Design a protein with these regions (language model features):
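A cross-kingdom feature marking solvent-exposed beta-strand/loop segments within repeated
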Residues: 23-60, 94, 119-129, 153-194, ...
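Short, structured motif recognition centered on aromatic/hydrophobic residues
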Residues: 14-16, 47, 108, 112, ...
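Single conserved hydrophobic/aromatic residue that forms the stacking wall/gate
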Residues: 1-5, 9-10
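Short, surface-exposed charged micro-motifs
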Residues: 7, 15, 59-61, 130-134, ...
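N-terminal glycine-rich anion-binding loops that anchor highly charged ligand groups
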Residues: 10-25
Length: 342
């Protein structure tokens, strides 16, 4: 971690920078007392471990008695940490000021949360191990659109933009997504976003997150969105989510399929596992057809957990075709789930 104390350009501030070479995180702490300007680099894990164990509200003092030592004092505690010259810390010098745009933190968090569970864990297909961010246009309206898929399920969500933006499509890595989500959960306001060919920058007031991007081409996800699913299944969300979760409890492997036996206005869900037993639940639904189809229970729970309204709509075609899932309370998000065999 790199620490810079300044009383000039950024008055009375401590700037902390950390990196793992894939991510760079910069945080400015204001209203600190700078007696003398300075900068150094030390171990982030050791410093974090010390600071988190100091009583809340206690004053902490830093000093640099020599180029190789950083002294940390608080009440009756004194620590001397090994450090190296700040000039050896790897910093990025790219110009991110081009093509900058802003989006509200809650909108950005929505896009991430509604897509991140569909990210692939298959390292051999690195282009699927993140979220694809790009600008789309519907009629004369511009959107920032996010998409993620592991080839068994897919999430797509979009947010309306005030104006068309200059933004090259990017694939944001999984590690970056989860780090960004943790920052957004504690922040409310506009997030400035800018990118160059291989990196992207997010600015949240006093915090900056810079990330490498995934080098690859995201597949044409539009062509796999079902367009002929005319059999509409309408269910109350909470009872559906609870029922799937309960029935799936029978299975030792959560990847076991939950079988849907659909008749007019009735859904029978069942799980049968030779090692642990079986379970069945019935729900009253709106449905005018007959159809048997099976799904991975985890996929259904992941989608249902992200819906905003009180209903879930599942559009079906036949036993072997993917299902299209919509949230009546959010027309800007869709989900596609492949069925399981048997």
């Amino acid at each position: 971690v790199r620490l810079v104390g300044s009383e000039m350009c950024i008055r009375d501030s401590l700037i902390i920078t950390a990196t793992d070479l894939d991510l760079i995180f910069v945080h400015k702490i204001s209203n600190v007392e700078i007696l003398e300007e300075g900068k150094t680099t030390t171990s982030s894990s050791i410093m974090y471990d010390i600071v988190r164990k100091i009583s809340s509200g206690s004053k902490i003092s830093f000093s640099n008695p020599s180029e190789s030592k950083l002294q940390l004092e608080s009440e009756k505690s004194i620590f001397n940490l090994n450090c190296i010259s700040a000039s050896e810390f790897p910093l990025t010098d790219e110009n991110f000021n081009q093509n900058e745009f802003s989006i509200h933190s809650k909108d950005l968090l929505k896009l991430l949360n509604k897509c991140k569970f569909s990210i692939s864990n298959d390292e051999t297909r690195h282009y699927l191990s993140g979220i694809f961010f790009h600008q789309t246009q519907v009629e004369d309206k511009a959107y920032l659109t996010a998409a993620a898929t592991d080839s068994h399920r897919m999430s797509v969500s979009k947010i309306r933009l005030n104006n068309k933006i200059e933004f090259e499509p990017v694939i944001l890595p999984k590690k970056t997504i989860f780090q960004l989500c943790s920052l957004l959960e504690d922040f409310e306001g506009d997030v400035k976003i800018s990118n160059i060919k291989s990196k992207i920058k997010f600015e949240l007031n006093d915090c900056i997150l810079i990330s490498k991007l995934i080098d690859g081409k995201f597949p044409n996800y539009i062509q796999v969105i079902p367009k002929e699913n005319q059999k509409k299944l309408e269910i109350e969300l909470k009872p559906f989510l609870n029922s799937v979760d309960r029935v799936a409890s029978v299975s030792l492997d959560k990847k076991d399929g939950v079988k849907f036996n659909l008749k007019k206005n009735m859904l029978d869900m069942s799980v049968n596992n030779t090692n642990s037993g079986d379970g069945k639940e019935s729900l009253s639904v709106k449905f005018d057809h007959e159809l048997d189809i099976s799904f991975n229970s985890r996929y259904l729970i992941d989608v249902a957990s992200q819906l905003d309204g009180d209903q879930i709509e599942i559009y079906l075609k036949d036993t072997g075709s993917p299902a299209l899932i919509r949230d009546p309370a959010d027309f800007d998000s869709i989900y596609v789930v492949m069925p399981m065999k048997g």
